[in-house]
Amino acid sequence: MERDQAIAKLISYALDKELIQPEEKIWAVNALLEALELDGCTLPEEAACGAEELPQVLDALLDDAYARGVLKENSIVYRDLFDTKLMGALTPRPAQVIGKFQALREQDPKKATDWYYRFSQDTNYIRRDRIAKDVQWKTGTQYGELDITINLSKPEKDPKAIAAARNLPASNYPRCQLCAENEGYAGRVNHPARQNHRIVPITINGSPWFLQYSPYVYYNEHCICLNREHVPMKIDRACFAKLLDFVGQFPHYFVGSNADLPIVGGSILAHDHFQGGRYTFAMEKAPVETAISFPGYEDVRAGIVKWPMSVIRLTAAQPDRLVDLADRILTSWRGYTDESAMILAETDGEPHNTITPIARRRGEDYELDLALRNNLTTPEHPLGLYHPHAELHHIKKENIGLIEVMGLAVLPARLKAELAAVADKLVSGGDLREDPLTAAHADWAEGFAPNYTFTADNAMDIVRKETGLVFAQVLECAGVYKRTPEGQAAFLRFIQQV
C-alpha cells in the first residue's frame, strides 16, 4: 500500500467513524503529516477503509516510517507507541467525548455505554484485531458452563524494549496504568501510549471517579471504574455503597472489586478501581444452594451459592440494606478465626481475611455476591493455601482475581502452543515427557487419556474440556470452605456467628 493511499484511507476511516468532522479533514491530514515527519502528500480521491482494514493501513504507515528512519525500532513495543500517536492525532478531545457521553446518558445509560464502547474500539484503543486472536471456549461443569480464554491480545515485551526500559530514568508519571494522567499520554518503552484513550467522569456514592474500558477486553464491554485519586484498593462499607450505586446508574452492567490483599487480589492493588461490563458469567447463573438468614435483615434474601468458591449472595429491593448487611459480614469475616477449618484472621499481625464483592441488578432488585477470601500461606503451599495448588500450575498459577472468581479463566498465552502439542501427542502416541512443550502437562494428560479414544478431529476438544475442568479445580482451591460436609458445616458456623 502506497504511503499517500494509506494516509487517505486513515482519514476516510476517521471520517466514517466520526472521529473527525468533514470541516477538520485538512487539519487532520496535517496532524498526521507532523506525526509521520512528512512535508506533504497527494491524496487519492477514493480511499474507503473499514475497521477490518485499519490494522493493514497502520502497518503500511509504520513500515514506511521505519524505512525512512522515523520509527527507530521495528518491534511491537515501538510500533504500538507510534501507531497510537497516529490514532491520537484523529481522536476527539476529552471535552467532546464527555459531552457526547453525557448527552446520550441523559436519554438512556445503555445508549451512552454502547456509543462509548464502540468509540473505544474505533480509536484503536481497544485493538479489535488482537482481541480476535484470543482463544475462547466454554466447559460444562457441575457449576455450570465456565468460560476459558487464552489471552493473546497483550503484546509480549521484546528484548530491545526491555533493555531500553532499564536505561530509562525512574518515572512516577503516570503513577500507574490506571491513573487519569494516562489520558493522552505519549507513552515510553515501559509504559503504553494512550493518546487515543478517553475517560469519562462519573460520581459514585458522592465520590469523583472515572469510567473507561479495558484495552484487553476479557469479556463483552469490559469496563474499569477508577478512583480519581491514586489511593489503594480497599474493601469496606463505602466500597459496597459505590458498587451498588454504580449498578443503580448503569443497571445493564455488573460491577465488582478485586480483594484488597496480596495473593487473593488483582495485579493492581495501589489504585482503587472496579471492573464491570455487560456479560453474564456462570457465577451469576449459579443458583443459591442453601438459604440462610441474618437476624434483623428479614427483608434481604440470602444464601450460599452453588459455586466452587465460598460465596454468600444477598438480594434486596433497597441497596442500603445490602450495604448494611455486607458491612456486617465483612467486619465479622475480617476478625474471624476457625483453626479447625484453617481460617486464621491474622498471623504475626498480618491480616488474611477479605472479600471479593460483585454487584448486579436482578430485575428491579439489587444483588451482592460476597466471595470470602483468605491469603494465608503455609510451608506446603507457599504461594497461598487458598490459591491454585502446585499440581495445577501447569495450567494456572497466577492469582485468582475478580474475573476468575466469576467463572472466567484468563490463561497465559503459552498454553495455545502447549495444549495443541498435548493434543498432537495424544493422537500420535508420542512421549509427552520428552517434548518441552508437553512435559509439564504429562501427569495431567496421562491421568485423563485412558477415558478417551483420541482422533485428529476430537483431541483438541477433549484437551480443552479437561483444561476447563482443571479451572474448576483451581476455583475449588481458592474456596475457603470446601464443598464437603465438614467444609459446609464450617461455612455455616461462620454465618451463624455473624
Write out the residue ranges for each language-model feature:
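Catalytic or ion-translocation cores adjacent to nucleophile or general acid/base/metal-coordination motifs
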Residues: 238, 247-267, 276-330, 334-337
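Beta-rich nucleic-acid/ligand-interaction surfaces
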Residues: 262-270, 348-354
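Helical scaffold of the NTase/Pol beta-like nucleotidyltransferase catalytic core
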Residues: 196-198, 230-255
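Active-site microenvironments that recognize anionic phosphate/pyrophosphate groups
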Residues: 1-225, 229-232, 306-308, 323-326, ...
